[in-house]
Curated annotation (Swiss-Prot):
GO BP annotation list: L-proline biosynthetic process
Keywords for the protein's UniProt record, in alphabetical order: Amino-acid biosynthesis, Cytoplasm, NADP, Oxidoreductase, Proline biosynthesis
Catalysed transformations (reactions): L-glutamate 5-semialdehyde + phosphate + NADP(+) = L-glutamyl 5-phosphate + NADPH + H(+)
Principal place of residence: cytoplasm
Name under which the protein is recorded: Gamma-glutamyl phosphate reductase
Lineage: Bacteria, Pseudomonadati, Pseudomonadota, Gammaproteobacteria, Oceanospirillales
PROSITE patterns for this protein: PROA
Pathway as given in its UniProt record: Amino-acid biosynthesis; L-proline biosynthesis; L-glutamate 5-semialdehyde from L-glutamate: step 2/2
Organism, scientific name: Chromohalobacter salexigens (strain ATCC BAA-138 / DSM 3043 / CIP 106854 / NCIMB 13768 / 1H11)
């Protein structure tokens, strides 16, 4: 596979994007007729094409990494940009896993006869055309393409300019897979230009694009949420909480508070604030202080919590809002379950929040009153993930209440339409 060394110059970006949109709309109608076997054949063929193109993928990725270093990208961004052999393996396995998932399209439920004699039910259908805007990670190209294809959606993928060579090499493999299954190449289109005007055009084409999914930093997501003329599936922050109730099992509380913070620091489902009931504080905070100190976690605590956290610095109002994505944790002691719930609903981001308790009553109240897309009892917030929820994979996590909420897998990329059977019925 020959590699081009630069992105093509496109004189009229808006016209180019509209052409992509028109082709995607036509392809989405064809995909509505595609069989599950045909979609799975394409996914397996994409996996084979990626496996055969390892050298090409690594060469393209080296060019992106070299350009990134020359442009001053920090090490964290370079790490996300890198396509290691293990990450290529993961992309290949991900395609095969999506192929093995049940196809939600065409599922019919709730069929019933009504007094008029008609039969009414619901059928699950694809959304149509999904636009994905993302940064850095080339593997998102494969993840998004596979989920959209399996759920019957055409997709337009606009990756970050820093990954343009990697994404174009991956796109070649995707096209090979589509061709092997006799599917239109426009079922998955990767935007070829790095011009930022492409994003503005993509999010302003309601006649072609049914939904936008942004994956990236807060600034990108805020801009798309503000400017998009089509629905957006997104979350802005991951300010996640663990609340240790007065009725908590101490060993569970320590294990969960440790894992939720220190298993990984950068994911959006990592705990950023620990709330502890005043009765539980002397039982769990000293042990947690030792654990966090051994792992280099900086604690920013309220005045009462600092009685058990000698090395903690005083928390400010900003700390309760903070998504650190780093070994930093805010800690607050509260007097009641009510105060904990109020804190979460005031400062949280409606992402994922957990309670540690042996009280069924307290657990049920927490589940009912915390306004988040995932609410947990006696489990680490790190479980808030499509794979861990048995969805197989996810396109992202939504903290909105419409259309999808929480990890968005195949079903979240579909909607339902009513279907009606009659036998010459007319309304009187």
């Amino acid at each position: 596979m020959a590699l081009e060394t630069s992105a093509p110059e496109i004189a009229d970006v808006e016209a180019y994007m509209r052409a992509l949109g028109e082709r995607a709309r036509d392809a989405s109608r064809m995909l509505a007729r595609a069989t599950t076997a045909q979609k799975n054949r394409a996914l397996h063929a994409m996996a084979e094409a990626l496996d055969a193109a390892r050298e090409t993928l690594e060469t393209a990725n080296r060019r992106d990494l070299e350009a990134g270093r020359a442009n001053g990208l920090d090490e964290a961004l370079l790490d996300r940009l890198a396509l290691t052999p293990a990450r290529i393996d993961s992309m290949i396995e991900g395609l095969r896993q999506v192929a093995a998932l049940p196809d939600p399209v065409g599922e019919i439920r709730d069929m019933r006869y009504l007094p008029s004699g008609i039969q009414v039910g619901k059928m699950r259908v694809a959304l149509g055309v999904v636009g994905i805007v993302y940064e850095s990670r080339p593997n998102v190209t494969v993840d998004a393409a596979s989920l959209c294809l399996k759920s019957g959606n055409a997709t337009i993928l606009r990756g970050g300019s820093e990954a343009i060579q990697s994404n174009r090499a991956i796109a070649d493999c995707i096209r090979q897979g589509l061709a092997a299954a006799d599917l239109d190449a426009a079922c998955v289109q990767v935007v070829a230009t790095t011009d930022r005007a492409a994003v503005g055009a993509l999010i302003a084409m309601p006649e072609y694009v049914d939904v936008i999914v942004p994956r990236g930093g807060k600034g990108l997501i805020e801009r798309i949420s503000r400017d998009a003329r089509v629905p957006v599936i997104k979350h802005l922050d991951g300010v996640c909480h663990v609340y240790v109730d007065r009725a908590a099992d101490d060993a569970k509380a320590v294990a969960i508070a440790d894992n939720a913070k220190t298993q990984r620091y950068s994911p959006c489902n990592t705990m950023e604030t620990l709330l502890v009931h005043v009765d539980a504080a002397p039982r769990v905070l000293p042990e947690l202080a030792r654990l966090y100190a051994s792992k280099g976690v900086e604690l920013r605590a309220c005045e009462r919590a600092r009685a058990w956290l000698a090395d903690a610095v005083a928390a400010t109002e900003d700390d309760w809002h903070a998504e650190y994505l780093a070994p930093i944790l805010a800690v607050r002691v509260v007097d009641s379950l009510e105060e904990a719930i109020a804190h979460i609903n005031t400062y949280g981001s409606h992402h994922t929040d957990a309670i540690v308790t042996e009280s069924v009553t307290d657990a049920r109240r927490f589940l009912a009153e915390v306004d988040s897309s995932s609410v947990m009892v006696n489990a680490s917030t790190r479980f808030a993930d499509g794979f861990e929820y048995g969805l197989g994979a996810e396109i992202g996590i939504s903290t909105d209440k419409l259309h999808a909420r929480g990890p968005v897998g195949l079903e979240g990329l579909t909607s339902e339409k009513y279907i009606v059977y009659g036998d010459g019925h007319v309304r009187s």
